[in-house]
């Protein structure tokens, strides 16, 4: 599995436009062969930072995706950014879920009072 993350920061006047373009791409990228997930996230503390995430079943699927026409639209969005993006590409060999947390901490549930819930 391969994860591609693109972190971008925009000026106030271009962020909404960039987000709108990226939102239109989520479905088409997600429907590409080999894509298991596509997400667009906006930073809750700095609303002008966007993160685009794609997860691919294989490196070959991702390479094919980079050559696709729709990737050119993402490159165009990068041109709107206030500076160069931060790019992260992780080649993941395994993924674990909450069972790892339980394995490390044991299966002791958090007390409601620890969570501020009574």
Language model segments and positions:
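Short, flexible segments with low predicted structural confidence
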Residues: 1-2, 17, 33-34
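Short, well-ordered beta-strand segments in beta-rich or mixed alpha/beta enzyme
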Residues: 2-8, 37-66
């Amino acid at each position: 599995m391969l994860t591609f993350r693109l972190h971008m920061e925009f000026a106030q006047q271009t962020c909404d436009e960039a987000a709108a373009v990226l939102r239109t791409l989520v479905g088409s990228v997600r429907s590409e062969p080999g894509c298991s997930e596509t997400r667009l996230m906006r930073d809750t503390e700095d609303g002008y930072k966007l993160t685009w995430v794609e997860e691919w079943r294989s490196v070959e699927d991702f390479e094919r995706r980079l050559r696709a026409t729709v990737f050119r639209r993402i490159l165009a969005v990068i041109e709107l950014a206030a500076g160069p993006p931060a790019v992260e590409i992780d080649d993941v060999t395994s993924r674990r879920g909450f069972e790892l947390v339980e394995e490390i901490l044991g299966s002791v549930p958090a007390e409601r009072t620890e969570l501020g819930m009574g």
